[in-house]
């Protein structure tokens, strides 16, 4: 299905207008072509194969393709959140041979114009990045918050054995003698999530800049956003329901194209207490590795000062492999003009 580009296009860079880009809404039939141009993207941790079909069905989301001479060369997804005031840009990818030519910028401008025509109340564009932000980026974007990215890998069977060696079979907190809490982390049901995040201000001091980040998606704690989040397979955890100082969201594991039998586990941590973070990390690992077989890439996002001690904990205590050194996840936004 073609989109009427007459309502959208700002002036194209001359080279691109001559190259002749066409834009269309993505369909199921485009999947194989999209995957073919997405090889090796995101270090093999591409979530799109798992999410593509559901993305096409989300009423508040538009997935746009750019074609050149009939071939898909770029994709971008835009999801309208925050009561219709924010467009969240996700999934950007450009075919290797077309990178560095300005395609991504043109596609983003196209998507912005399209969303503005459909949702005139949209005020802000928001996206999450893991590359180094430079002066030009800060001319375009405001930094909302940033988290340290800790990426480790392990075989599920090996980690299960290691957890049993650490005597974590039943009582995780008793195995962490330095823990600042004697009570185990609490997994929240939907009622408790609503109460904590929407009807009290208890999470204000825990969430980074009042932002719930779930697997690269930043949301404000609003009922409309919570309706989106609660449809997903996520474990929500806090250290204390009455007075939380540490919270985490663990997205259920899904397959990624690193190789056969590779899974991705995403854990978003909020708060500044290392011991409580370790407790919740272990609880998530224990819960989700029990049924997994094969290799797991586990990516944790946490307050930057916690990165180094948590990396040491992963290496020395859990004997899992650190995949890369410190990098940052940055949530940025700009006004829609």
Curated annotation (Swiss-Prot):
Gene3D superfamilies per UniProt: 3.40.630.30
Reactions the enzyme catalyzes: L-histidine + acetyl-CoA = N(alpha)-acetyl-L-histidine + CoA + H(+)
EC number(s) on file: 2.3.1.33
Residue ranges crossing the lipid bilayer per the database entry: none
Domain of life: Eukaryota
Annotated InterPro entries: Acyl_CoA_acyltransferase (IPR016181), GNAT_dom (IPR000182), Hisat_C (IPR056483)
GO molecular function term, any single one: L-histidine N-acetyltransferase activity
Domain N-acetyltransferase: 21-156
UniProt propeptide residues: 1-2
Record CDD domains: NAT_SF
Keyword entries, A-Z: Acyltransferase, Transferase
UniProt miscellaneous comment: Strong histidine N-acetyltransferase activity has been detected in ectothermic vertebrates and not in endothermic birds and mammals.
Task performed by this protein: Enzyme responsible for the N-acetyl-histidine (NAH) synthesis, which is a major constituent of brain and lens of ectothermic vertebrates.
Protein name: Histidine N-acetyltransferase
Organism annotation: Scomber australasicus (Blue mackerel)
